């Protein structure tokens, strides 16, 4: 796994959290229902044999090869880490990290001091395109 090329930044003479170069995306990718069958934590015996979505494998490995950061962000628990890592390796996914324990239930609303973009997975990994959408923001 390659280390991300973070750029150190200062504001007002003080160091702030580093940033990725603008041309590199920091992808957080769900696992169940996004790159493979949707398997709930209550049925972990199915995780080792989950059906991979070939289009997801190809697209994520393409993004990795282009230098983007690939991190899986899943509702699977730490107890599922070993089977999940083995499954990703078996299918040939290239990635930088995996965050376990994402809150379950959807309806996510991410608040951050950095730019955040969201793409809802609707069944296939195509090219990403620009679209205008209505978003909720804090009142100024």
Where are these regions (language model features)?
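HAD-like aspartate-dependent phosphatase fold
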Residues: 2-140
């Amino acid at each position: 796994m390659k280390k991300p090329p973070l750029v150190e930044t200062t504001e007002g003479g003080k160091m702030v959290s580093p940033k990725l170069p603008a041309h590199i995306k920091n992808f957080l990718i769900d696992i169940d229902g996004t790159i493979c069958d949707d398997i709930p934590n209550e049925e972990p015996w199915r995780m080792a044999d989950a059906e991979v979505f070939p289009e997801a494998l190809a697209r994520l490995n393409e993004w990795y090869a282009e230098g983007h950061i690939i991190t899986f962000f899943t509702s699977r628990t730490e107890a599922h880490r070993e089977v999940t890592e083995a499954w990703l390796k078996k299918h040939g996914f290239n990635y930088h990290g995996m965050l376990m324990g994402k809150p379950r239930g959807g309806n996510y609303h991410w608040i951050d001091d950095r730019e955040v973009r969201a793409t809802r997975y609707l069944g296939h990994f195509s090219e990403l395109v620009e679209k205008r959408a209505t978003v909720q923001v804090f009142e100024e």
